[in-house]
Swiss-Prot record:
<feature type="binding site">
    <location>
        <begin position="115"/>
        <end position="121"/>
    </location>
    <ligand>
        <name>UMP</name>
    </ligand>
</feature>
<feature type="binding site">
    <location>
        <position position="142"/>
    </location>
    <ligand>
        <name>ATP</name>
    </ligand>
</feature>
<protein>
    <recommendedName>
        <fullName>Uridylate kinase</fullName>
        <ecNumber>2.7.4.22</ecNumber>
    </recommendedName>
</protein>
<dbReference type="InterPro" id="IPR011817">
    <property type="entry name" value="Uridylate_kinase"/>
</dbReference>
<feature type="binding site">
    <location>
        <position position="67"/>
    </location>
    <ligand>
        <name>UMP</name>
    </ligand>
</feature>
<feature type="binding site">
    <location>
        <begin position="9"/>
        <end position="10"/>
    </location>
    <ligand>
        <name>ATP</name>
    </ligand>
</feature>
<keyword id="KW-0665">Pyrimidine biosynthesis</keyword>
<feature type="binding site">
    <location>
        <position position="51"/>
    </location>
    <ligand>
        <name>ATP</name>
    </ligand>
</feature>
<dbReference type="GO" id="GO:0044210">
    <property type="term" value="P:'de novo' CTP biosynthetic process"/>
</dbReference>
<comment type="subunit">
    <text>Homohexamer.</text>
</comment>
<keyword id="KW-0963">Cytoplasm</keyword>
<comment type="pathway">
    <text>Pyrimidine metabolism; CTP biosynthesis via de novo pathway; UDP from UMP (UMPK route): step 1/1.</text>
</comment>
<comment type="function">
    <text>Catalyzes the reversible phosphorylation of UMP to UDP.</text>
</comment>
<dbReference type="GO" id="GO:0005737">
    <property type="term" value="C:cytoplasm"/>
</dbReference>
<keyword id="KW-0067">ATP-binding</keyword>
<feature type="binding site">
    <location>
        <position position="46"/>
    </location>
    <ligand>
        <name>UMP</name>
    </ligand>
</feature>
<dbReference type="GO" id="GO:0033862">
    <property type="term" value="F:UMP kinase activity"/>
</dbReference>
Length: 225
């Protein structure tokens, strides 16, 4: 199976900072999927690293430049994961999809970050999945699925086990994004998922759920075309 993972920067690099054990656990999960015969791509978010830098930079500059800072943070996080993957990855963070595909064709795990200003890594992962004609897109975040509202600030939010892409658009369509923003699925990614008719799963970004997402035994939300 050809699978693209959108790995939230905040799950790889939590507020407490970098953890050797945490990064190693994610690397082992992706290595195991590769050993099982799957072709694995991982797009890593900027997370707290990006937000900390952007919050300071925003006092001095515009959103476009803040986007560039965020992209660099995603690539730093990508390099950490690449270092933990060892020989299963290439020590290079591609900046476009053609270079990314070359790495996949080398039978390596692809790890990359952001590509364009104003595009979140969710949108990058969805576009990559469309570009390589992936079988599955998995969005691994700090929330365990898609809810009717943001469960982090709405107690009446209801988790949805299965929705279609049109319903996803309705849920995410009213959200606005700025540099460093995070959401379960951002509006642009939702549009790409709908356009490309991508089978998508949203899970809590822990190694166990990453492995379970392939078999279908996950506890997240399945999004169908």
């Amino acid at each position: 199976m050809d699978v693209v993972f959108a790995l939230g920067g905040s799950v790889l690099m939590p507020k407490e900072g970098a953890s050797t054990e945490n990064i190693q656990n994610y690397a082992q999960a992706f290595k195991k999927l590769k050993e099982m015969g799957h072709r694995v791509s991982v797009v890593v978010g900027g997370g707290n690293t990006a937000r900390q830098y952007i919050s300071v930079a925003r006092e001095f500059t515009n959103e476009s430049f803040c986007d560039e800072i965020g992209i660099l943070a995603t690539r730093m996080n990508s390099m950490l994961l690449i270092s933990a993957l060892g020989k299963d990855a290439v020590k290079q963070v591609p900046e476009n999809f053609k270079d990314a595909e070359l790495i996949l064709n080398m039978d390596k795990i692809l790890v990359m970050g952001g590509t364009h200003p104003a595009h979140t890594t969710d949108a990058v992962s969805a576009t990559l999945a469309e570009f390589i004609d992936a079988d599955l897109l998995v969005i691994a975040t700090n929330v365990d699925g898609v809810y009717t509202k943001d469960p982090r600030c709405n107690e009446d939010a209801v988790k949805l086990d299965k929705i279609n892409t049109k319903e996803l658009l309705e849920i995410t369509g009213s959200n606005s994004m700025s540099a460093g923003s995070s959401g379960v699925v951002d509006p642009l990614a939702s549009k790409i998922i709908d356009r490309a008719k991508l089978k998508t799963i949203v899970i809590k970004g822990i190694p166990e759920e990453i492995l379970a997402s392939i078999s279908g035994n996950h506890n997240g939300t399945t999004i169908t075309p």
